From Swiss-Prot:
ATP binds at K11, F59, R87, T93, R104, N114. InterPro entries: NDK-like_dom (IPR034907), NDK-like_dom_sf (IPR036850), Nucleoside_diP_kinase (IPR001564), Nucleoside_diP_kinase_AS (IPR023005). Homotetramer. This is Nucleoside diphosphate kinase. GO terms for molecular function: ATP binding; metal ion binding; nucleoside diphosphate kinase activity. Belongs to the NDK family. Pfam families: NDK. It is an enzyme of class 2 (transferase). The gene is ndk. It comes from Marinomonas sp. (strain MWYL1). Its EC number is 2.7.4.6. The active site is at H117 (pros-phosphohistidine intermediate). Major role in the synthesis of nucleoside triphosphates other than ATP. The ATP gamma phosphate is transferred to the NDP beta phosphate via a ping-pong mechanism, using a phosphorylated active-site intermediate.
Length: 135
């Protein structure tokens, strides 16, 4: 496996539940190195730009509203096969379908308030990291 970087966002629902530290502990136990991190409040422009690929989808407005509803923690995780391993740790988008022990099974409440975001490919990770960290 290659050393990769991936973007992780702890979403407003998980931040509001005060589980940032628990999620970071899970990242570290899974062998990820947290190489960049910041807590920010997304506005409509920043959230809308990040999710621009979904602009024509029916859930877009609700997604932007949710992502701007409170602060988020944006992080860059580094590790062997980071993109796929992070997605496995997150679990299925719908927490009702997420495997026991995944972040979404443990911390998410709905398909919308699903606790975390993770890049879906190495290419997406590169683009998403640049979007938030300018690299």
């Amino acid at each position: 496996m290659a050393l990769e970087r991936t973007l992780s966002i702890i979403k407003p629902d998980a931040v509001a539940k005060n589980v940032i530290g628990e999620i970071y502990t899970r990242f570290e136990r899974a062998g990820f190195k947290i190489v960049e991190a910041k807590m920010i409040q997304l506005d409509d422009e920043l959230a809308g730009g990040f999710y621009a690929e979904h602009k024509e989808r029916p859930f877009y407005k609700d997604l932007v509203a949710f992502m701007t509803s409170g602060p988020v923690v944006v992080s860059v995780l580094e590790g062997e096969g980071a993109v796929l391993r992070h997605r496995e740790l997150m679990g299925a988008t719908n927490p009702k379908e997420a495997a026991a022990g995944t972040l979404r099974a443990d911390y998410a409440t709905s398909i919308d308030a699903n606790a975390v975001h993770g890049s879906d490919s190495v290419e997406s990770a590169t683009r998403e990291i640049a979007y938030f960290f300018g690299k």
